[in-house]
């Protein structure tokens, strides 16, 4: 018995399904729905280029070629005008039906979060407590002046750095002055260590004494110089 011929299932591939088989070099329509695509007519000018138009309108060169049915080697100046495909927003297609959702979104954006409400209430409490305190009783100096490093602005940080540098300079200058004033005292304490220096310090300068021998030597030298 001959096997019964198999019939192709309904909705199969090919022409029965309604889809067109792609071939090399064929022009295929865009996969985007034509309802979401809006075409803008551009009048060509001598300085226009395909890349420049793509950058100007925010589309790709392939989209412009596909919309105007241009091949790769074709020049854009074969036509007087080019159609630029621009995708429209999905909300524009509802014709105002989505206005309620937009209003709800706007209300959600306007409403503050719980964290913001808590922080604002905390600030108000701090301000109220500060105003309730008498003017005479202020915060201690270390609490009033000390602020966290991450809360300091750039100018405050630079001012703090300058003050620290000036304080370090003053401390270094004071140390130098103390060192200069202490040097002579140390020097004077070193000299009297030897007994001869101690004797000179006590008795004063030793007077010169001339003996007969020194006198004769001096006379002989004078005679030699005279000759």
UniProtKB/Swiss-Prot annotation:
Residue spans of biased composition, Polar residues class: 143-152
SMART domains: LysM
InterPro entries: LYSM1-4 (IPR045030), LysM_dom (IPR018392), LysM_dom_sf (IPR036779)
UniProt region (Disordered), positions on chain: 95-157, 169-227
Listed PROSITE patterns: LYSM
Keyword Nucleotidyltransferase attributed: no
UniProt keywords, alphabetically: Phosphoprotein
UniProt biased composition (Basic and acidic residues): 216-227
UniProt domain LysM: residue ranges: 40-84
Biased composition (Acidic residues): 98-108
Gene3D superfamilies named in the record: LysM domain
Pfam families, sorted: LysM
Phosphoserine PTM positions: 23, 33, 99, 166, 181, 194, 212
Name of the protein this chain belongs to: LysM and putative peptidoglycan-binding domain-containing protein 1
Species of the source: Rattus norvegicus
Source species taxonomy: Eukaryota, Metazoa, Chordata, Craniata, Vertebrata
Gene this protein is translated from: Lysmd1
